């Protein structure tokens, strides 16, 4: 991970913790931060570990959005857990931390271009359309651990033999 981006990420995280400490009038431990999330997820909060993990590829491609939205989003999960315990991940407590404490819209999903981090996909067909299945789902079909059906016609999806990406 780029040293400058890593530094900025840690600074945003510390700033969020500081805002939370002022709002809740108590101290919070500084979380650890790593850059090892893979796939389409931008970040993940590990509540019991007090740790934030970020996707390094998406971070490099979308640094401003990570600094302004993703990192506060993940810190809000940690703060919510430490203040309220186990509650719904994007429930009213988390939304309150995002909006009232951090002053940020409580968005639950990102809108980043994920082509660079998207895994292999395989074409499957039913009676009415085609579907791209992830490599994980494709492998489950090959190992006969799962079958998938169309949401419209309810027919089983069958592999066409085409790898899409």
Swiss-Prot record:
GO terms for biological process: response to stress. Zn(2+) binds at residues 73, 77. Binds 1 zinc ion. It comes from the Bacteria. It is found in: Cytoplasm. One of its GO terms (molecular function) is zinc ion binding. The keyword Metal-binding applies. Pfam families: SprT-like, Zn_ribbon_SprT. The keyword Acetylation does not apply. Residues 20-158 form the SprT-like domain. The active site is at residue 74. Its main location: cytoplasm. Its cofactor is Zn(2+). Keywords: Cytoplasm, Metal-binding, Zinc. One of its GO terms (cellular component) is cytoplasm. PANTHER family: PROTEIN SPRT. NCBIfam families: PRK04860.1. Belongs to the SprT family. This is Protein SprT. It comes from Vibrio parahaemolyticus serotype O3:K6 (strain RIMD 2210633). The lineage of its organism: Bacteria, Pseudomonadati, Pseudomonadota, Gammaproteobacteria, Vibrionales.
